[in-house]
A protein has these predicted regions:
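Short acidic-glycine-tyrosine-enriched beta hairpin
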Residues: 76-94
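Asparagine-centered strand-capping/turn motif at beta-strand->loop junctions
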Residues: 100-101
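Glycine- and charge-enriched low-complexity intrinsically disordered segments
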Residues: 114, 118, 122-135
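A short hydrophobic beta-strand segment most commonly corresponding to one strand
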Residues: 87-93, 104-120
Length: 149
């Protein structure tokens, strides 16, 4: 399974997160795969030193795929870490969060900007937050059924 953390701005004005995975279905050659879904644009970014951004929201609804490096995120809910291979599904465009690099390795990542209607095949595994958005249930259903991506 591919680890995925969902980060969002809640109706309470705070940032929240939950642990999960990318919903995958059996595919050819014993592979597991998700349905295809549209993205608006893709870019790469590398951060060598801790930028000390402080609390900030994300500029868009997006997937952030960590290629190398490790970091710790802080939200109003608590903290979580990302490592190479992890995916951050972020919809935190209002409340904000902070992050710090862990170790000496730069954080290399791919940003995949999503449309507002794009359903991401996120499946929660251990909800961290008691606050859940209605959209997460719709996305969870799509991930389970393989529909709507």
């Amino acid at each position: 399974m591919i680890r995925c953390i969902r980060l969002w701005s809640g109706p309470d004005g705070n940032s929240h997160f939950e642990e999960g995975v990318v919903g995958l279905q059996p595919g050819p050659r014993s592979d597991m795969l998700s349905n295809k879904f549209p993205i608006t644009s893709v870019s790469f970014q590398e951060t060598d030193a801790d930028p000390k951004l402080g609390w900030h929201p994300d500029p868009a609804r997006q997937l952030v795929i960590t290629l190398s490096g490790a970091l710790e995120f802080t939200t109003h809910d608590g903290r979580f870490s990302l490592r190479a291979g992890d995916i951050l599904f972020t919809e935190d465009t209002v409340a904000g969060h902070d992050w710090n690099l862990l170790g000496e390795q730069p954080w290399r990542r791919l940003y995949a900007i999503l449309g507002q209607a794009t359903l991401v095949p996120f499946r929660p595994t251990a909800p961290h937050s008691a606050v859940a958005r209605p959209e997460s249930r719709k996305a969870e259903t799509a991930a389970k059924t393989g529909a709507g991506l």
